[in-house]
Amino acid sequence: MINAVTLVTADMAASSTFYEALGFERVVGGPDTPFTTYRVGDGFLNVQLDPAHAPVPAIWGRVIFWVVDVDAMYERALVHGYVPEMEPTDAPWGERYFHLHDPDGHELSFAKLLS
């Protein structure tokens, strides 16, 4: 089981604003620190500052977060001025999801099983 994922950021303040606006619970760190940890369900998302961080390549993968209500998360993103790639969609593989990029270009997916 994966317990934590670490993403690199060029701007911790922008990342902190983004993840906290989406409701991620900060455990340690924050906008003025080089390392921040958020609780995500039973696991953790770490964000590590690297001011020289190059943009994320077009193909790198994505991090998927299971949420209770995909549509509510989508609306929360919109309320805070973030622009998801797509509206929530029911996929043929049995989940409802949408994608959103964080300030550093990491692709995030918010999903829930349909059944």
Task: Name each model-derived stretch.
Residues 20-27, 81-83:
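Conserved acetyl-CoA-binding loop of GNAT-fold acetyltransferases
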Residues 1-16, 61-63, 111-115:
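N-terminal beta-strand motif that seeds the catalytic metal site of vicinal oxygen chelate
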Residues 3, 33-34, 61, 94-96:
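Residue-level marker for the onset of beta-strands and adjacent loop->beta junctions
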Residues 25-58, 107-112:
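Conserved short beta-strand elements that form part of the metal-binding/catalytic scaffold
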Residues 1, 55-60, 91-92:
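Short glycine-enriched loop/turn motifs at secondary-structure junctions
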Residues 11-13, 63-107:
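Vicinal oxygen chelate
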